[in-house]
Amino acid sequence: MPVTVKMLVQKVKLDVVYATDNLLSKEITTSDISRPGLEMTGYFDYYAPERLQLFGMKEWSYLTQMTSHNRYSVLKEMFKKDTPAVVVSRNLAIPKEMVQAAKEEGISLLSSRVSTSRLAGEMSYFLDASLAERTSVHGVLMDIYGMGVLIQGDSGIGKSETGLELVKRGHRLVADDRVDVYAKDEETLWGEPAEILRHLLEIRGVGIIDVMSLYGASAVKDSSQVQLAIYLENFEAGKVFDRLGNGNEEITFSGVRIPRIRIPVKTGRNVSVVIEAAAMNHRAKEMGFDATKTFEDRLTQLITKNEVSQ
């Protein structure tokens, strides 16, 4: 989905100094943000006009020391048709030459009360997430104790029903059936629902239910980091499953690897409780508490003790 200036204004809560509907619908194609430096001296080699242009205290201070004619000339040269918008931080007084150049070149002029560094961070965070390439995967994404858990498995194995049970147990639904995942950076994976499926769960025999309407706003979440994958598979006698928890299976989405746990599904087995335990155990491991390692250490000590006693 294209990212527009209007979306940036709404998400980062920017004030519109000058813009039209057409200008607000202009697409932003890169998450890079430029803070003009040498450009204000008239040096425009390697200038990237397709980036958002951010003016902070330093840039504003330099502009105010220029004559009105020079200020207009520099800004006129800087504001190109490809430039999606110009943003001024700290509610700084915007020179009339900047407004004039923006109107003449057809560029949205925006303002914010927050500091330049914070504003740059907020805009970069939004643009990085919005412009990242999406990959659609089949499954149910849940927020369990603050951890994003992607539940996958064969069709009809009960992923959505498990998600519903987890919602009833106080956890939050992020996406059902189709999960759009993207890499926020090299080590961080995020997931969100397709817009048409937001807050919806499909339960065989019941149909589509609106989780937010039935269980309230606390039962849903718009997006979540994906930290653990759970794969549900039918229990088969003789098939080997990890019983100690020392398996290191991983799965890769959008270039990011996350751990995956396979859970056998069998009649009478409370899968939602098992998934809760898996999520809590994974978090404990990340905090340095590994029950498997503790057991192995105890076993080693017991074996050593028995050998000595003999």
UniProtKB/Swiss-Prot annotation:
Residues covered by region (Important for the catalytic mechanism of both phosphorylation and dephosphorylation): 201-210
SUPFAM superfamilies named in the record: HprK N-terminal domain-like, PEP carboxykinase-like
Residues the entry annotates as binding ATP: G153, D154, S155, G156, I157, G158, K159, S160
GO terms for biological process, alphabetical: regulation of carbohydrate metabolic process
Cofactor dependency: Mg(2+)
Positions of the catalytic residues: H138, K159, D177 (proton acceptor), R243
CDD domains xrefs: HprK_C
Stretches for region Important for the catalytic mechanism of dephosphorylation: 264-269
Subunit description: Homohexamer.
Other facts noted in the record for this chain: Both phosphorylation and phosphorolysis are carried out by the same active site and suggest a common mechanism for both reactions.
The name this protein goes by in its record: HPr kinase/phosphorylase
Lineage: Bacteria, Bacillati, Bacillota, Bacilli, Lactobacillales
Gene: hprK
